[in-house]
Regions:
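Conserved nucleotide-sugar phosphate-binding/catalytic loop shared by glycosyltransferases and other
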Residues: 7, 29-80
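Conserved nucleotide-sugar donor-binding subdomain of glycosyltransferases
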Residues: 66-108, 152-154, 158-162, 168-169
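Active-site proximal beta-strand in glycosyltransferases
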Residues: 100, 116-135, 141-146
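A donor-sugar binding/catalytic signature common to diverse glycosyltransferases
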Residues: 101-105, 284-327
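C-terminal alpha-helical cap of glycosyltransferases
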Residues: 347-348, 359-375
Length: 375
């Protein structure tokens, strides 16, 4: 099985590790990951065979706001074309040995695999419209359609919205190509709750399994007080959120007996301080999410899912003008402007008790079984 993991951030890698671990429990099939950067490092550290081939463009983020989104979109299109060449070389060399292509939001590999007759392709995709409760709520406004036999319907899947005005015409063309690829996939795995239709399969949140009790983790991590976890993902885009979180924490620390752990990620280097714990990059972030009393993060999907499944209260501030993060945050009632209310939000959240984890969340296992059935 070839597993193409988007290297933009670390969320794709973390959930793909969870899926791969479950696949190994079901079938004895070789898994080869293709990714890049910090995502490659994380996957390799978990013991999986991986190729470090992708080099994604970086966002330009200033004060928590995405700048020049159209420039980034153009860089992404160039990156996509490069990835298609890389994916084509990998797939053509290995298609006889790996007839299944799994892609976590890497459309380049999906595009290549759909031109290879012997290959089956599975897409993991989480851009679901935040205001829709069922798959049909937005049917009248979305143009994505899937066909299964003679049955046709409109999928409740979102589109990219980085640009506006006449520039959006280029983005609309990209979205049409993306919809075409989605429609042709053998399966589209959506890590959310919803009604399965045609090639869409809603599996629920996909998170890594926590194998220790929460109290044991807290003891091992040395957590004795209420603990805030601040994490910024796999890029330096969270610098502004970290700074604002530390400002709010230092004010609250004068009134509350509370600690703060900072996980800044692999690309953001910050000075140490005596009033918080700076861990830098950790490969077991999910365990820290479970052990903490509050998570403050950008609105990346994987951290949100981990917070939800593990029962840890969270504050999720999106990058301004990053449509996907803004959608994720909207579902939880947050927006970028809430960054100015962090002190009050933290105080409110710390009053909440840690909830029981959702032990029946089986997104990784369900996805692994879908993959194994196509092997």
């Amino acid at each position: 099985m070839l597993f193409f993991t988007s290297p933009i951030g670390l969320g794709h890698a973390t959930r793909d590790i969870a899926i791969a671990e479950k696949v190994k429990q079901i079938v004895n099939d070789e898994i080869l990951f293709i990714s890049g950067g910090a995502a490659y490092d994380l996957i390799s550290k978990e013991g999986f065979q991986a190729l470090n081939l992708y080099r994604p463009p970086s966002f330009t983020v200033d004060s928590g706001k995405l700048r020049n989104p159209f420039v980034w979109l153009m860089k992404y299109i160039i990156y996509y074309k490069r990835c298609k060449k890389i994916a084509e070389e990998v797939i053509r060399k290995a298609s006889h040995k790996h007839p299944i292509i799994v892609s976590d939001e890497d459309f380049a590999s999906i595009a290549v695999s759909q031109n290879i007759i012997l290959s089956k392709n599975i897409l993991i995709y989480d851009m679901v419209d935040p205001t829709a409760n069922t798959i049909n709520d937005k049917a009248s406004r979305l143009a994505i359609t899937s066909t299964y036999g003679n049955f046709k319907f409109e999928n409740n899947i979102g589109e990219t919205h980085f640009t506006s005005g006449f520039l959006h015409e280029i983005e609309k063309k990209m979205n049409r190509s993306m919809r075409h690829l989605i429609n042709k996939c053998d399966k589209v795995i959506i890590p959310d709750y919803g009604d399965n239709k045609a090639n869409l399969v809603y599996v629920g949140p996909i998170v890594r399994e926590v194998k220790s009790e929460r109290n044991s983790l807290r003891y091992n991590f040395g957590l004795t007080r209420k603990t805030i976890l601040v994490c910024a993902g796999g890029t330096d885009a969270g610098r502004h959120l970290i700074q604002k979180s530390l400002e709010a924490y230092r004010k609250l620390k004068k009134r509350f007996d509370v600690d703060l752990i900072l996980v800044s990620g692999p690309n953001l280097k910050l000075d140490d301080s005596n009033d918080f714990y700076n861990l830098g990059f950790v490969d077991n972030l999910h365990e820290y999410v479970y052990a903490s009393d509050l998570v403050i993060s950008l609105a990346g999907r994987s951290t949100i899912d981990e917070s939800t499944v593990y029962g840890t209260p969270g504050i999720f501030i999106p990058i301004k003008n990053h449509f996907e993060q803004e959608q994720n945050a909207l579902r939880l009632g947050y927006k970028y402007e809430d960054i100015s209310k962090l002190e009050r939000l933290i105080e409110e959240k710390l009053e909440l008790s840690h909830q029981n984890p959702i032990l029946n969340s089986r997104g990784a296992e369900v996805t692994a079984r879908i993959i194994s059935e196509l092997l």
